[in-house]
A protein has these predicted regions:
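Short, conserved, GDST-rich strand-edge loop motifs in beta-rich repeat architectures
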Residues: 4-34, 88-99, 183-188
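Secondary-structure boundary elements
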Residues: 39-48, 78-85, 96, 106-113
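Flexible internal linker/loop segments at domain or repeat junctions
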Residues: 134-163, 171, 194-195, 199
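Beta-propeller fold detector
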Residues: 48-55, 114-118, 155-160, 201
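C-terminal hydrophobic structural anchor segments
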Residues: 178-201
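Beta-propeller blade signature
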Residues: 32-45, 100-109, 147-150, 193-199
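Alpha-helix-centered segments that form part of catalytic cores
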Residues: 30-55, 69-77
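Conserved beta-propeller blade repeats
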Residues: 1-14, 24-28, 56-86, 113-136, ...
Length: 201
């Protein structure tokens, strides 16, 4: 199976991630009941809506905004064994403002929807295993790389002295190393890092 979203809607939100030429028929709806996350059977090609944008808004809206927001899923990924998935949900920002991101997880069939974080600063992420995820996000220690547990309030900075800037993150197959990069520096180079979790260096 595979997960899919409305890439026309994503194109309107963030062209670098969306598909051009695909129109969003729900463009005028902030969080439609007929659109959201779809599950695709890769053998038959059939798809079905498993989580609607209206459902997502209802689990993320509390204490986040004073007004109704138009939202979209920007990133979505299965955990290691495919039993749950995570999605980054973002609002369409007003002119001159930056979008904010909520973290939501669910079972593969769309059940057991859980809001890990309300709308705040959240960037790159990676599943560690079937329960834990890495997120570069705004948390108790400011913007840091955090280890977060699905369906709980557990959040812990990985190494506040090392992960000072946002970057793509991924674990080695044995779970002992983190591969990390950076945004381009002044000479347009991206730095690549490997970090040993046990040795903390």
């Amino acid at each position: 199976v595979a997960l899919a979203i409305n890439f026309g809607r994503l194109m309107d939100f963030r062209p670098v991630c969306g598909y051009s030429g695909v129109k969003d028929k729900f463009k005028d709806y902030n969080h439609p009941e007929e659109d959201g996350v779809f599950l695709i059977d890769m053998k038959t090609g059939k798809s079905k809506l498993i989580v609607s944008y209206d459902q997502i808004w209802n689990v993320t809206k509390e204490n986040s905004f004073t007004e109704d927001q138009k939202i979209t899923v920007n990133h979505i990924t299965f955990n290691k064994n495919g039993t749950r998935f995570v999605m980054l949900v973002r609002n369409f920002p007003s002119k001159g403002e930056r979008w904010r991101t909520a973290i939501v997880t669910a079972n593969t069939d769309g059940s057991d929807l859980y809001c890990l974080s309300g709308y705040t600063y959240v960037s790159h992420y990676s599943w560690k295993d079937d329960e834990y995820l890495l997120f570069y996000m705004d948390g108790p220690y400011g913007k840091q790389l955090y280890l977060v547990s699905d369906k709980s309030s557990f959040i812990k900075p990985v190494d506040p002295d090392f992960f000072l800037e946002d970057g793509h993150c991924s674990y080695s197959p044995d779970g002992e190393w983190i591969l990390y990069d950076s945004y381009p520096d002044t000479e347009n180079y991206r730095n690549l890092y490997i970090y040993n979790i046990r040795k903390r260096k």
